[in-house]
Amino acid sequence: MAQHFSLGACDVVGFDLDHTLCRYNLPESARLIYNSFAQFLVKEKGYDEGLLTLTPEDWDFCCKGLALDLEDGTFIKLAADGTVLRASHGTKMMTPEALTEAFGKKEWRHCVSDKRCTSDKPGVSDIPCCSGKCYFYDNYFDLPGALLCARVVDSLTKQNRGQKTFDFWKDVVAGIQHNFKMSAFKENCGFFFPEIKRNLGKYVHRCPESVRKWLRQLKDAGKITMLITSSHSDYCKLLGSYILGEDFADLFDIVITNALKPGFFSHFPSQRPFYTLENDEEKDELPSLDKPGWYSQGNAAHLYELLKKMTSKPEPKVVYFGDSMHSDIFPAHHYTNWETVLILEELQGPEMEKPEEAEPLEKRGKYEAPMVKPLNTLSNKWGSYFIDSVSGRGRAEDSVVYTWSSKRISTYSTIAIPNIESIAELPLDYKFTRFSTNNSKMAGYYPLVHHTLGSQDTDSKIISTEK
């Protein structure tokens, strides 16, 4: 594979919507998502009302890349080899001694080193995958749910005097269905959509003009542009009109809503057909995709056949931008062999404030509300999303290891950027260095490597991905 990646070499450019083209005000959207689920659990399922009360400090628990053991309520931060770096029971962090006793240096019990989980490509099959008995929090929409679930575990443990196993996940899933079912936006039900409609500007950032111009530039350069989102069409229209303008759909040749990713990429056409839309409701099932337009559900195989026809090429080159490793990047890379650009807001540079550098509460104005830690900043409880330190491992001093999430980024992403704005003013033929260059773990970050990676003194600390 070539050392460099260029949009100019791509025939088709596709985008996710939420947290990719549409950037959210993370402190506000996190509170809204948390409250939407907490209200449901308390009011509909009878959970402790204490779940409705949060302090700013509570948000430090949130860190992308955590896994929840659905059986025992343990949250796990994994190393690249599937061993456990840090863990908590609910929100209560485990001590190093308890960590060693519970997990040792073995792969976590829900990790499976199995080529069927990843790929037969060299260098890929050594990434452990995880069973259906755990849930990974890999995006900002999910992340408030990690804090809520951890507090549920705390509450149930206290109520039941040390409860060891849990069955709350079914209620969390019911909360998702209640707030985000296909009819929720139209019916104005649940807690999320009614508030979003009332105060959209509080939660969502408009795209800068540079991004709108860049999308037009892609079309003017002859690229086919696509919007592929799991959001339903009515919510997509609300967001698209706000962030890009009323004519936002004209910026895309193909719009696919309710895409049900990652299944959009992995399912056979017979399992996931396309549907036409009428007044935001799904109508006719389509045996194939014959022309550009706006569709619902669907599959990557039929889409690719249409792209062949539109480009008059037997193998058009596609790149897809997304923020979720689980729903966007891994499946687009693994099942369709598309180029992938990961949106990683942790890379935002100057906007990235460490918690210890934040202004102390006592120095703030008397009536200024305490700030909620943005979800893309460093967690004191969990440390860096990208790396962590490990004692021993056969060495006389601590070693620094890559996390499971970090290794997946460098394996399945072509490049990673903080947001689309960061590349919108570059020429389309700009040559980005791929992650795959010399098997580098850091080459694909643009414009900057995250400070917890870039600041490593490799003369005094050893970056290790070994078991």
UniProtKB/Swiss-Prot annotation:
Record: residues binding Mg(2+): 16, 18, 323
UniProt entry tagged with the keyword Kinase: no
Nuclease found in the keyword field: no
Origin: domain of life: Eukaryota
Signal sequence annotation: none
This enzyme's EC code(s): 3.1.3.-
S-S bridge residues: none
Record keywords: Acetylation, Hydrolase, Magnesium, Metal-binding
Entry-linked InterPro entries: HAD-like_sf, HAD-SF_hydro_IG_5-nucl, HAD_sf
Modification type N6-acetyllysine: residues: 181
Active site: 16 (nucleophile), 18 (proton donor)
GO molecular function, a single term: metal ion binding
Family listed: Belongs to the 5'(3')-deoxyribonucleotidase family.
Protein name (record): 5'-nucleotidase domain-containing protein 1
Origin species: Mus musculus (Mouse)
